[in-house]
Amino acid sequence: MTIYISQGRYTAAAIRAMTAKPEDRSEAIAELLAAVGGRLIGWYLTLGRYDWLIVAEAPDERTLVSTVLAAAAGGSLSDITTTVALSAQDTVQAFGQAGELAKKFRSAGADYYGVPVELAQNL
């Protein structure tokens, strides 16, 4: 399964509610992900631009997006961003594949301005 990192902010109303009645939100997120075949790897309260960070596994992007939308539909979340995370093994494979593709790719403008293709690919 693919690993995703999501970050977001709580609304002021959500912060007021959780301050009045603290609760472990990781349980709700874990249940939401499990309902679609995903898994919560970690949930963290964070400092800075975002209030929380979630690391999760999901079968595919559509499935992950459905969980984000379901959580956001409650109105307590905002400014959500999600990133796909690749393992070290997947990264090595991606760079290997990129190396093969780069040999076949013609850079924009490579045939113009007298720049040989070999040099343009190194720019």
Language-model regions, residue ranges each:
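A compositional/biophysical signature of low hydrophobicity enriched in polar/charged and small residues
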Residues: 1-123
